[in-house]
Amino acid sequence: ALVHGVLPQAPAVTEVLEDIETLNGMATREELDIVKVSFHALGHFRQSYCLLRSGGALGRGCGPLVVSNRVIKPSDLSQCRVAIPGRMTTAALLVRLFAPQLTDVVEIPFHHIMDAISAGEVDAGVIIHESRFTYPRHGLHEVIDLGQWWESTTGQPIPLGGIAARRDLGTQRLLQIESALRD
């Protein structure tokens, strides 16, 4: 409704459809007034953006998975070359928290990670979105469910992402945006 101008009190917006790491980067460069971001990325631009109260994504049972084309023990992950969907994604943060000794990390757009694993370009990859449901069809095996690991370790839902807005829009404009998102 917001994007299509259906809400009369809402400001006009221009839709930008990109993967989450691209959106994180655009926020880092302050290119957008309102943007969906990874919670992990928010710390990189919190001086310029504030997190809105609406539109956040906290999940249970829907976190990133690490998968491989061969059986890998989770404890051996730090010796592998691992694809991540961007350095500022929550998925990247979770795999680094799980395997802090992991050093061989390759950034690959999320929709190409399974192909990179199948082609042997990486040993494993952190997958997000619908990939977590389709990876068995690609002959891949789960190494670890990072969402399940996070939830069992912390007892908290996975902090996936939220909507951020530029602070320099001013209080009135930010309240208007917040109200439109709630509607």
Predicted segment positions?
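A structural signal for short, well-ordered beta-strand segments and their strand-loop junctions
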Residues: 27, 36, 107, 125-127
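Bilobed "Venus flytrap"/periplasmic-binding protein-like clamshell domains
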Residues: 1-9, 17, 62-123, 130
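Short loop/helix-cap segments at secondary-structure boundaries that form the rim of catalytic
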Residues: 7-8, 44-46, 95, 134-138
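Hydrophobic/proline-rich hinge and linker segments of small-molecule sensing/allosteric domains
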Residues: 51-74, 151-168
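A residue-level signal for conserved active-site and pocket-lining positions in enzyme catalytic cores
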Residues: 27, 95, 177
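Pocket-lining segment of extracytoplasmic ligand-binding domains
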Residues: 109-183
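N-terminal hydrophobic or amphipathic helices and topogenic motifs
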Residues: 1-57, 68, 75-81
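Conserved beta-strand segments of alpha/beta enzyme cores
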Residues: 12-14, 50, 103-106, 141-142
